[in-house]
Swiss-Prot record:
GO MF annotation terms: oxidoreductase activity, acting on NAD(P)H, quinone or similar compound as acceptor; quinone binding
Enzyme Commission number(s): 7.1.1.-
Family: Belongs to the complex I NdhL subunit family.
Pfam families: NdhL (PF10716)
Complex and partners: NDH-1 can be composed of about 15 different subunits; different subcomplexes with different compositions have been identified which probably have different functions.
Protein's name according to its UniProt entry: NAD(P)H-quinone oxidoreductase subunit L
UniProt subcellular location: Cellular thylakoid membrane
Keyword Translocase attached: yes
Amino acid sequence: MSIENLLSSVSLDTLLVIGGYVALGGLYLVVMPLLLFFWMNWRWHVMGKIERFSVYGLVFFFFPGMIVFAPFLNLRLSGQGEV
């Protein structure tokens, strides 16, 4: 069974729903966690109390995506420690 036959047998509504789920899943697991990581790296030492509290809430909300990228991103200051 080819992919064209498979896609033609599925209704357009079903394909739209699947596409919506894939888009939301990608937004939740990839796009927002990366944006949040870069935002934290950029603003970490100048954040106010309310901004830091809201960032902690977003980290909690996007935790599944954050844990995927955590081993690859480093938020430490450059120039710290001996090389």
